[in-house]
């Protein structure tokens, strides 16, 4: 849990070696990047809002990692973190985002017209389609570090702004604090709402403080466009629907996101963005587009095939269980999404999902008929 700066200054009574965390059993990007020299150099620094190196790394110290998934192991507490503590964040970002250099520039493309295809994914295999991203409001500390007042301000800005949306985006805000446990659970089971903050990563980073104060969900009347407020990021914007029409999901995502950004800019509150990191978010894994385009696809034959993981690697996609990270695939239904966030535009990332999933469905149909998929193996993207 993040401490005040007085506590950080008190720690300086001890040497860097005495304060350096034991990372000997850790499997995360932070543990890989953090050396005693870096710790020594950065331990007395703090951002203007008072976030420190120990605040950044605490979640990765407390959670050594996952046997199959390399976790990130650090979070940002405000926009300035990525600059003040770049000696740690730069190697973490480079390692997590496939060699993305401190001098690289990120590209943004939210023009849905540039997506090719995506309206013809076979609904017998592709059960649902979803695109999400995160956004952070300039001048307000991020969830690991924000005060109650800041968090409530984010919520108020969202309530006031989203209430002005019309047409297909007209909807309503539901604060978590006034929901019954049964209502919350139903929304979680329907994949509309974030889980309760029981994840050790959320707890150790300080993101679950004061729960459920200032948290909520807004969705349009059709429940196809949602905004999560004050979970891991200030805003999580989600477009989703049943079936395989990723083109329509992406169109709604781009149009709705633009409307939301315009509302915040008009209120004098733009989103955190820079040309190196793209959209600035709490977890370094989401920098860039913050975008995850995913489908639930049923592939009972392909998922057992020896080349399944190679197909994923070559198409730059990743698999999760039916319920998301750390869950099992129920009935051979996998959540397949883009592996990249930084260095590729939104259109490029969704295009990879569309093309890769289309190929997987084709492979599944081949395997159903007892045929080989060797000639369908893609080149490395």
From Swiss-Prot:
It is an enzyme of class 2 (transferase). GO terms for molecular function: ATP binding; creatine kinase activity. Residues 125-367 form the Phosphagen kinase C-terminal domain. One of its GO terms (biological process) is phosphocreatine biosynthetic process. GO terms for cellular component: cytoplasm; extracellular space. It holds the Pfam family ATP-gua_PtransN. It is found in: Cytoplasm. It comes from the Eukaryota. Gene3D superfamilies: ATP:guanido phosphotransferase, N-terminal domain, Glutamine synthetase/guanido kinase, catalytic domain. It catalyses: creatine + ATP = N-phosphocreatine + ADP + H(+). The keyword Transferase applies. ATP binds at residues 128-132, 191, 236, 292, 320-325, 335. InterPro entries: ATP-guanido_PTrfase, ATP-guanido_PTrfase_AS, ATP-guanido_PTrfase_cat, ATP-guanido_PTrfase_N, ATP-guanido_PTrfase_N_sf, Gln_synth/guanido_kin_cat_dom. Residues 11-98 form the Phosphagen kinase N-terminal domain. Its main location: cytoplasm. Dimer of identical or non-identical chains. With MM being the major form in skeletal muscle and myocardium, MB existing in myocardium, and BB existing in many tissues, especially brain. Belongs to the ATP:guanido phosphotransferase family. Reversibly catalyzes the transfer of phosphate between ATP and various phosphogens (e.g. creatine phosphate). Creatine kinase isoenzymes play a central role in energy transduction in tissues with large, fluctuating energy demands, such as skeletal muscle, heart, brain and spermatozoa. This electric ray muscle-specific creatine kinase (MM isozyme) is isolated from the electric organ, which derives embryologically from skeletal muscle. It may be involved in the electrical discharge process. This is Creatine kinase M-type.
């Amino acid at each position: 849990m993040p401490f005040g700066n007085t506590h950080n200054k008190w720690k300086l009574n001890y040497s860097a070696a005495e304060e350096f965390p034991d990372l000997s059993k850790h499997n995360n990007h932070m543990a890989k990047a953090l050396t005693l020299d870096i710790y020594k150099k950065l331990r007395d620094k703090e951002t203007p809002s008072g976030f420190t190196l120990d605040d950044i790394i605490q979640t990765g110290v407390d959670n050594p990692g996952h046997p199959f998934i390399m976790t990130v192991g650090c979070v940002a507490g405000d926009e300035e973190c990525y600059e003040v503590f770049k000696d740690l964040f730069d190697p973490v970002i480079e390692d997590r985002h496939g060699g993305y250099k401190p001098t690289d520039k990120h590209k943004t493309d939210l023009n849905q017209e540039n997506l090719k295809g995506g309206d013809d994914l076979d609904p017998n295999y592709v059960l649902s389609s979803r695109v999400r991203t995160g956004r952070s409001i300039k001048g307000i500390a991020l969830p690991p570090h924000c005060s109650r007042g800041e968090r409530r301000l984010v919520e108020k800005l969202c309530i006031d702004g989203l209430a002005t949306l019309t047409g297909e985006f007209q909807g309503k805000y539901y604060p978590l604090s006034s929901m019954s446990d049964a209502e919350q659970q139903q929304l979680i089971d329907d994949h509309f709402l974030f889980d309760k903050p029981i994840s050790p990563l959320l707890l150790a980073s300080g993101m679950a403080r004061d729960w459920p104060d200032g948290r909520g969900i807004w969705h349009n009347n059709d429940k196809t466009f949602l905004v999560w407020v004050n979970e891991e990021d200030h805003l999580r914007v989600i477009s989703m629907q049943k079936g395989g029409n990723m083109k329509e999901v992406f169109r709604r995502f781009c149009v709705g996101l633009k409307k939301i950004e315009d509302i915040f800019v008009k209120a004098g509150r733009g989103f955190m963005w820079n040309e190196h990191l793209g959209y600035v978010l709490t977890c370094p894994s989401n920098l860039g587009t913050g975008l995850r385009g995913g489908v639930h696809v049923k592939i009972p034959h392909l998922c057992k095939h020896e080349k399944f993981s190679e197909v994923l690697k070559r198409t730059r996609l990743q698999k999760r269980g039916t319920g998301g990270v750390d869950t099992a695939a129920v009935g051979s239904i996998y959540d397949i999404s883009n592996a990249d966030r930084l260095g590729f535009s939104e259109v490029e990332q969704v295009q990879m999902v569309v093309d890769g999933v289309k190929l997987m469905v084709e492979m599944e149909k081949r395997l159903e008929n007892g045929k080989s998929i060797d000639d369908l193996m893609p080149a490395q993207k």
